[in-house]
């Protein structure tokens, strides 16, 4: 199972939208996909209509109170896409893990071992901060995708992310690689050109060839709880996420 952490310290850059739509596109290529929601806001879980406090979440899985198999949501509305949901219970998990005097970074990696052979891909939707969910995702991952929206503050927090990735590569997970920065909400503006130029100057951060073009259809599809390939398959962003799946599959 190839594990991809989708991370940025900024909110609203398209992490959850990317996780959901990339999962749907990979599934359309006959790949079995596990989506792990690690953000306490639960946007990815809400997208798949699975936010339910009466069932186990990824928080209980990381703490060993339930297995990943017990917490899996298989009825996501998207064939071959399963979900480990997240909600505010992640706050408790973060506090508990922080108080552990032993290795804190492998809770998620170890919890996912039981389902490792069941999927081709695992997409981990990280919160917009470097909490224990994000750290555990990076230490479990093979690859990192960094969504970057095209506004004037787009690269805020990039240095902190890159420093953390470097620490993980050095001490915990040497195989971890940056797949690339993914431009989202892309329009041909001076801000987009400036963001592109700034990213190209950053050492060790490849820029993915695919960009996700801006369209209101993204918000509409999110409100409808449907991936773009189902909601509006002929829109520009649907084509872009299809291209992203092909690009990621080829790396």
Label the predicted regions.
Residues 1-251:
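P-loop NTP-binding core
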């Amino acid at each position: 199972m190839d594990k991809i952490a989708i991370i940025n310290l900024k909110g609203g850059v398209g992490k959850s939208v990317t996780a959901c739509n990339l999962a749907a596109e990979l599934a359309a290529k006959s790949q079995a996909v596990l989506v792990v929601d690690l953000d306490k806001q639960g946007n990815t879980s809400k997208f798949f209509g699975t936010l339910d406090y009466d069932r186990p979440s990824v928080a209980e899985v990381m703490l060993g109170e339930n297995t990943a198999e017990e917490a899996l949501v298989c009825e996501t509305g998207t064939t071959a896409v399963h979900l480990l949901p997240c909600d505010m219970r992640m706050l408790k998990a973060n506090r508990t893990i922080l108080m552990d005097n032993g290795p804190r970074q492998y809770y998620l990696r170890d919890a996912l071992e039981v389902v490792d052979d069941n999927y081709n891909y695992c997409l981990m939707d990280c919160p917009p901060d470097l909490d224990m969910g994000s750290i555990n995702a990076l230490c479990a991952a093979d690859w990192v995708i960094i969504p970057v929206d095209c506004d004037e503050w787009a690269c805020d927090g990039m240095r902190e992310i890159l420093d953390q990735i470097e620490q993980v590569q050095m001490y915990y997970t040497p195989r971890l690689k940056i797949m690339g920065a993914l431009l989202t909400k892309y329009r041909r503006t001076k801000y987009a050109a400036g963001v592109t130029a700034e990213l190209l100057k950053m050492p060790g951060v490849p820029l993915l060839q695919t960009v996700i073009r801006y369209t209101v259809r993204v918000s509409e599809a999110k409100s409808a709880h449907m991936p773009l390939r189902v909601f509006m398959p002929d829109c520009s962003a649907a084509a872009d996420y299809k291209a992203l799946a092909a690009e990621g599959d080829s790396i």
